[in-house]
Amino acid sequence: MMTRTATDLARASLEAVKAGKRDEWLALFDDDSIVEDPVGPSALDPEGKGHKGAAAIARFYDTAIAGIKAFDYEIERTCLCGDEAAVLVTFRITAADGEPRVTNAINIYRRAPDGKLAALRSWHHGSEE
């Protein structure tokens, strides 16, 4: 099997979310991975330390992603350097409250030595469409 790059993992992550495939998305991460979405303190992560480990990442999915009614994205640009990919992406979602939103983000995906995602860090700003 060919080793996936961080860019491949980024696309796989986005496609799994778009398709609503929770288990497929969670399988992209290793046991010690961290998700910071967004980076810094937020309603889902008041201390801004991220969601670390399989159980915390699963809770993040269930709380932040599972309720999204519609999800689409457009990758504007990707920069790959070693085991990291910086992805400039525009998300178009319909949130759980039924409101459409457009969010521009810079996501950093870091590939672990085992070929899974070691980290997903997202900087974003949202606005209603």
Label each PLM-derived region with a short phrase.
Residues 1-32, 129:
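Short, low-complexity N-terminal intrinsically disordered segments enriched in polar/charged residues
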Residues 4, 23, 28-82:
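A solvent-exposed, acidic/Ser-Thr-rich amphipathic alpha-helical stretch
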Residues 32, 80-84, 109-117:
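Short, solvent-exposed coil/turn segments at beta-strand boundaries
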Residues 61, 88-95:
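Short beta-strand segments that buttress and anchor functional surface loops
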Residues 67, 93-102:
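Short, cysteine-centered beta-strand-loop-beta hairpins and adjacent loop/turn segments enriched
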Residues 73-79, 90-92, 104-110:
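Hydrophobic/aromatic beta-strand elements that line small-molecule binding cavities or substrate pockets
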